[in-house]
């Protein structure tokens, strides 16, 4: 593997944050300097965490996942007051979801290792599975290349319900059939059978979406020391109840902190992305087997548009009696993460970084400092045949990342033709239009009743001109079919659907192409944290 870095233009909060713009950096409590990480350690040492209870739960959970010894040792290390975590999170996507989930894990593993060495303290990697999430449309699909198109392949659950991913049962046989259909779109390789067995072994141990995700991630990163946590696990929820109570007692201040921070963001010229109802309590409650967001209504906590109503005392009692009924929303999830883990750094994608910039005053409301927020590593893989296509078309490796591939294709095609087709036909259409306008005036002058017919005549002529243009372009494209297919392959591989590769392709494609140790070999590379995009030639 050969790794290269390229500067890809970014926009909004992420671009300004990475470029060191002070105005947006003031929306975060720590800069990304070594001194700031030392200050973070100092601040964490002044807080108390329920380490032993957390260790007991994480040991049980990761042992059930058959995690490696290095993971279990890292869990035990969390019992020491001088151990800290680098953390990231994601929904439990089928087959682990898009590649960026894998890249988040790689990011926390690398940063944890680096900070352990530079700060001289134990730093362990933790991945927070958003098991409470109930938006199945976000996790029930993957993309494949089929019939010369990128297609979204959805797993249709037989019994869909608005339950969390941790509680949504997975039909193993149906999912197995869905996975087999996906693998049929991949080339048959020496690794295909092993990868299918690898995936099926994880599937057979799974009852829910989160189970399947957790087993796969555990197997892919078997020797890395990665700790997994299911944010909706009932045993973890018991440990979180004191903080749920704090949120309930301060929900108005939380909402006010969010609104005030969003005003700051607006004044800086950015558009807030967190949308909440004005009376939101920012906590979900399970009602009739569905996650329902609680709202404040005249001093009562209500759900389902007032169909269910609780007093403060009733809600607190229910939390103590049945903690598994409660979960966080987008605003309180980062707060709960901060409550549970001694977080040295949080790693997030561009969208997460933007929405965390809206949470600073929310953190302060509950007495926390926002942890250092580190943008995750971004990676694209370039297979050998794609590198050859780029070379054959005389494109630079950076071209597909800095330009629209369709535009590159159009420019290349126009360069193969002495005179631009579009320009020639536009000129012809204009000249014909001028002639026909004069002709229509003459016809109307002689016989006004033929005016409408003359207009239709012009339309028919234009239709024929456009037909000729399409036929000419089709013939030219057929002439350069080999080269244009290279552009199509480049688009599918590097910018599928016009998006970054890591937002569309799934890791199973690369495991199938390069073997089960593919991710291990990727992690042997050294990555920088300067915001540049990492291009890995395979």
Curated annotation (Swiss-Prot):
Keywords recorded for this protein, A-Z: Coiled coil, Ligase
Alphabetized GO MF terms: ligase activity
Coiled-coil stretches noted in the UniProt entry, renumbered to this chain: 248-268
InterPro entries associated with the record: Bacillithiol_biosynth_BshC, CC_BshC, Rossmann-like_BshC
Enzyme Commission code(s) on record: 6.-.-.-
TM ranges: none
Record has Coiled coil as a keyword: yes
Entry annotated with the keyword Nucleus: no
Domain of life of the native organism: Bacteria
One Pfam short name: Rossmann-like_BshC
Family listed: Belongs to the BshC family.
NCBIfam families: thiol_BshC (TIGR03998)
Its job: Involved in bacillithiol (BSH) biosynthesis. May catalyze the last step of the pathway, the addition of cysteine to glucosamine malate (GlcN-Mal) to generate BSH.
Name by which UniProt lists this protein: Putative cysteine ligase BshC
Lineage: Bacteria, Bacillati, Bacillota, Bacilli, Bacillales
């Amino acid at each position: 593997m050969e790794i290269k870095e390229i500067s890809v233009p970014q926009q909004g909060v992420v671009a300004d944050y990475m470029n060191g713009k002070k105005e947006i950096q003031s929306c975060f409590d720590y800069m990304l300097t070594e001194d700031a990480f030392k200050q973070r350690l100092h601040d964490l040492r002044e807080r108390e965490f329920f380490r032993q209870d957390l260790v007991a739960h994480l040991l049980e959970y990761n042992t059930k996942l058959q995690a490696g010894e290095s993971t279990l040792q890292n869990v035990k290390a969390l019992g020491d007051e001088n151990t800290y975590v680098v953390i990231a999170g994601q929904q439990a996507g089928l087959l682990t979801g898009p590649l960026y989930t894998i890249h988040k894990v790689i990011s926390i593993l690398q940063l944890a290792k680096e900070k352990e060495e530079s700060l001289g303290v134990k730093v362990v990697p933790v991945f927070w599975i958003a098991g409470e999430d109930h938006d199945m449309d976000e996790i029930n699909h993957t993309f494949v290349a089929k019939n010369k198109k990128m297609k979204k392949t959805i797993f249709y659950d037989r019994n869909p319900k608005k339950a969390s991913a941790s509680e949504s049962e997975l039909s193993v046989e149906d999912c197995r059939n869905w996975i087999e259909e996906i693998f049929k779109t991949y080339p048959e390789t020496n690794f295909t059978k092993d990868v299918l067995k690898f995936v099926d072994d994880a599937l057979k141990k799974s009852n829910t979406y989160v189970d399947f995700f957790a087993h796969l991630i555990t197997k892919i990163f078997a020797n890395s020391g990665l700790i997994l946590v299911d944010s909706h696990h009932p045993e973890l929820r018991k440990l979180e109840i004191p903080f749920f109570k704090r949120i309930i007692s301060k929900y108005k201040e939380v909402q006010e902190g969010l609104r005030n921070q969003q005003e700051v963001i607006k004044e800086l010229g950015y558009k807030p992305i967190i949308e909440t109802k004005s009376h939101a309590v920012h906590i979900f409650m399970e009602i009739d087997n569905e996650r329902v967001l609680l709202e404040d209504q005249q001093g009562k906590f209500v759900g389902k548009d007032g169909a269910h109503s609780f007093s403060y005392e009733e809600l607190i009692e229910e939390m103590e009696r049945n903690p598994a009924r409660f979960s966080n929303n987008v605003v309180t999830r980062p707060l709960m993460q901060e409550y549970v883990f001694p977080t040295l750094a949080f790693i997030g994608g561009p969208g997460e970084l933007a929405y965390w910039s809206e949470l600073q005053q929310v953190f302060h409301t509950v007495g926390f400092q926002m942890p250092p927020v580190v943008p995750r590593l971004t990676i694209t893989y370039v297979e050998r045949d794609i590198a050859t296509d780029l070379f054959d078309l005389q494109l630079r490796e950076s071209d597909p990342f800095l330009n629209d591939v369709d535009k590159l294709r159009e420019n290349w095609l126009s360069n193969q033709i002495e005179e631009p087709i579009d320009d020639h036909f536009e000129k012809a259409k204009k000249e014909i239009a001028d002639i026909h306008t004069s002709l229509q005036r003459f016809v109307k002058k002689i016989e006004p009743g033929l005016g409408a017919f003359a207009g239709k005549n012009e339309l028919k002529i234009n239709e024929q001109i456009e037909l000729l243009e399409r036929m000419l372009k089709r013939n030219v494209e057929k002439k350069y079919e080999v080269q244009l297919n290279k552009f199509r392959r480049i688009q599918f591989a590097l910018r599928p659907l016009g998006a970054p590769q890591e937002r569309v392709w799934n890791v199973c494609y690369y495991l199938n192409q390069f073997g089960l140790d593919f991710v291990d070999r990727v992690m042997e590379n050294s990555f920088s944290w300067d915001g540049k995009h990492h291009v890995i030639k395979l």
